[in-house]
Amino acid sequence: MFGMRSRHHGGLWRCESVFMWAAIVVALAQSASAQDRKLYLERSAFDVIVLKRDGSRHEIMPLKSRSAEVKRTGSLKVRLMSDTAEEKVISWAEIERIDLFEIMLLAEANRFVVAKKFNEAFKAYNLLLQAYPKTPGLDPAIQTFLFINAEHFVAEGQWNLAISTLEELFDRNPGFQRGGKSVFSLLSDVVSLILEDLIVNKKDFPSARQMIVRLDLKYGSGDRRLAATDKWRGSLVSLAQTKMAALKQLIDKKEFLAARNVSADMMMIWPDLDGARELAEGTVRSYPIAVVGVTQRVNTPDPLKIDDWAARRAGRLTERSLVEFVSPSPEGGYYTSPFGSVEKSDDYRHLYFQLRANSRGVRLSSYELGDWLLAMADPDGPHYRKRWAAVAERVEVEDDTRIRVDLRKADVLPEGRLRVLLSSYPPLAEHVASMRPYSIKENTEEHVRFVRNPTAISQGVNPPAELYERFYANFDKALEDLRYGRIDILDRLFPADTAKLLEDGAADVVVKPYALPTVHFLALNKDRHAYLKNNAFRQALIRTIPREIILDRLLDGRTLSGCRVISAPIPAGRSMNDTLAYAYNENIKTRRYDNGIGRIMMSVAKGQFEDIAKKKKEDPPALLPLTLAHPEDKIARFACQIIADQFELIGVECVLKQLGKGMTDDPQRNYDLLYVAATISEPVVDIERLVGRDGIGRTDDQYVNYYVRRIAEATSWRDIRRHFESLHQTISSDVTVIPLWQLTEYYAHRPGIYGLDDNVVNLYQNIDNWVLNPNPSDFE
């Protein structure tokens, strides 16, 4: 509490020197001023001499000697505070006494305490400690202040302040007493109040346990042992014993999900309970269950749905693709297949599949896969895939484990065209069943329960038997439950929480990045709102959105690598050297927020509509309210509310429409603007689904559609980058969508869970390798 450097003391001794008194008494009488009425705390240091003749008080610059016991013979020189330039002389015989500044300040500090002005008292005592530590009576006065201040904190319910104050007093004087109450007894009372609040009211068992352990280390021996810690330690042990008994019953009944939760509670309450560790570890080994906190609910799992975070996440559990994106690479991404490996030739003219047997010795035959590849190239068949048919020329079975596909022309990413769900090809149903690791057992408003498929093939030792996704509408609550062990993993962090956790280096939470950012933009439905067909109107909208400000608020004023405003809905990567940024054109600058320009462009748009109407001799179209649809997640809600408010400033009414549970789009397109957060793993492959004719941000702009087509047809990376530059320029100039920002994404888990990697594309990408550990250190 005390010990910080006081501003009031800076340069105090520079003004001091030894003076010999030689002044005229009459001159001293002229030094009194209105300064007397100011608090000593608010003034520069000075001493006071009191004259015998009339008892008058006169302020002088501080004496060098700070002792009241000085030789009172002869005369002294002094400089009056009212006239420091001239030395005055006075005989000691004329002086009744000298009041030193620190004595006066101490008396004032004591008066502050009596008046319960504790902030002022603290400042005064702290100044005395810094500048005048040898002031007589200072330490006893501070002890009294600390005790009275602690009593005040207790009365106000500010128990944490009370305990820190009492601990400081205890460190100064363990035997301090006042009014029949000792510092130790009051400390024990306050500790009991805090522990009761933590245990009974807040159920914050880790904080209570940590407090007991800390206080035991400090006061836990002999007469210094706190009765409160003994009492509440016993309560925690008793609660943990109750949980242990319940856990054993649940295990006997094979109610494993409930057992997992009770086990977590037991370990959170008192992990050192005899037998607790062994029982918790046995529970996990026999039937491991992972509880994942999610902030976006899943509607229909789909690992390929780029605009639906929850669908992609859950889709990895219930669906697999023929070819899967694993991670970014310098030229496109790395791909693999559940059936084996897939790679292209150096000249981009051939694609090879090498099939392998699973852990049970079962392997898809090359003939079965070959039939599917041919079926996807057959325009008359039910499994036709236009993008695959455009490049596949011939399928050759080289042997029972290897297939070669000859391409019509060079194609830089032919494997990307085969991200097709296994379930879309029924002839492989027998093989597909073993590829789906989990199925949905329950799906409610609050949770989704996944259970391991009995036929699923695992590459890991003991993957989760069940996975329980718990929905949180509140990021803060989700993070709290992660810290307390109520959930094992939080699948997505709010940007500000990510930045804070990384800055703080929190030991109780492990934060890891995803490989891919999300790009956020507003898709336009021009068919529904006439004004959206006007470029000037779209320019007005983008100029009116304070994208930098919204992003800053999402980050709570912090910085996070890769989070930035963008000029097109294309991944910009975390840095200029990020391989994922190959499609982004850094030469195109983002339009900065300028409400003035927004108003001007709004006037231009209205003028253009009026001119057209005048030529047609009809009324111009009415400016109807814009309907801005958005998913239910916090980021979208937060951003869209600000955007809607900003549109009002240029005279555009905006109505917000929250989509249903787990929805990221409205199939009926009953909106004018749609907030989209897309995860683009491979721009070459995904751009068509993003802004193509049937994409999320589809447009009738012929140039956009032209460049999307040219990208799909490109035969070299050079051509791809060139076409992306042109596409980027077109999207930016014509505002075919309203780009917002890019967010780098992170997830978090409690310590003690293994197999969760950095830079995964999907949280469940390596779920077979997860190892759950209930070690109590997870919660410390």
Where do the model's predicted regions map?
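Gly/Pro-rich hinge or "lid" segments in bacterial periplasmic/extracellular proteins
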Residues: 313-314, 320, 327-329, 400, ...
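Long beta-strand-rich cores associated with HINT superfamily self-processing modules
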Residues: 749-780
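Structural transition elements
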Residues: 561-611, 630-638
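Ligand-site clamp/hinge motif
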Residues: 356-359, 375, 455-500, 655
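Periplasmic binding protein-like
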Residues: 482, 648-694
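N-terminal lobe/hinge region of extracytoplasmic solute-binding protein
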Residues: 293-346, 374, 433
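Surface-exposed binding/hinge segments that line
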Residues: 354, 361-362, 384-428
